[in-house]
Structures are given as structure tokens and as C-alpha cells.
Amino acid sequence: MIEIIFLDVDGCLTDCKIIYNANGEELNFFDVKDGYAIESWLKLGKKVAIITGRKSAIVERRAEDLKINHVYQGVGDKFAVASEILKFEGLSFKNAAAIGDDYNDYKILDAVAWSFKPKDAIKELDVKTKLKHKGGNGAVREMIELIIKSENLYDEWSKRWL
């Protein structure tokens, strides 16, 4: 069973675009449907970890909103961080899924039981499942739904919405 999902931010939770306002503040767009899926996943007692190569106050804010307690930014070696999280949670890569979109996600995607990439990820990433949705446009929701359905938890999970 998948107990934890590892999420990349740029290109997975967002569409990989960064916008700066007139004050130089960074802005990103997050898909609300991804957020609902994450919240419902957490209500099942599952875990979520954000591991991203960049640092952004916006990511911290989004993680707070969704009550994600594992948030690691400015990470060079995502595999090493994922290993530490799994150790802390008493889990292994056999209990993990991950979504990534670029070369810096390769090692973690190769290690997990179920790997995903958004429709617009680089083609060189070899994953178990290529999603139909683009990053920042429902890819994380699609990933969670596929996991939930494969583990026969969809009815319980979907009740979290009502």
C-alpha cells in the first residue's frame, strides 16, 4: 500500500511558470482540485511530503493551507531527503509514490513503488505512469485518484468531499 506521496512543486503542483509582481514578489498558481485531493488523502491517514529544488514563501504558505507537515525546499538531493522522511515515518520506498517532471526528480522516481510524471514533463523521465494532466492543472489529483482506486479506497476517499 502507498502510505506517502512525494511531490515536486515546479511543473507538478504548479505549471512551472513564475510570475513577479511590481514589487518583485513571486507568484505561482496552484490547482484547487489538486489541493482538495491532497486534503482528502491526508484525511485517510496518509502522508504527503513536498521536496523541491527551489525556495519560495508561497510553497510554505500552500503547504500550511493544506496541512502538509513535510516541506523541504532548496533541496539538491531529493532521494536523500525522501530517505530521511521515510526513516522518520517508519516507512520504505515500497510504501511511496512520487511525481516529478525533470532530471532532478529522476533518482526519487526510480526508487519509489509508483512513479508519475505530468503530461508536460520531460520525455526522458522513465516512470510507471504518465499522467493525462499537465503540471499545475490536475496532475496531482489524477495521481492520487489512481492510487486510491488501485487500493480500493475510492469510496472512502470520495466521502471526504461530502
Please place each PLM-identified region on the residue numbering:
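Alpha-helical substrate-recognition element adjacent to the catalytic core
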Residues: M1-D77, R160
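Mg2+-dependent phosphoryl-transfer enzymes with acidic/Ser/Thr/Gly-rich catalytic loops
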Residues: G24-N28, L66, H70, F79-L162
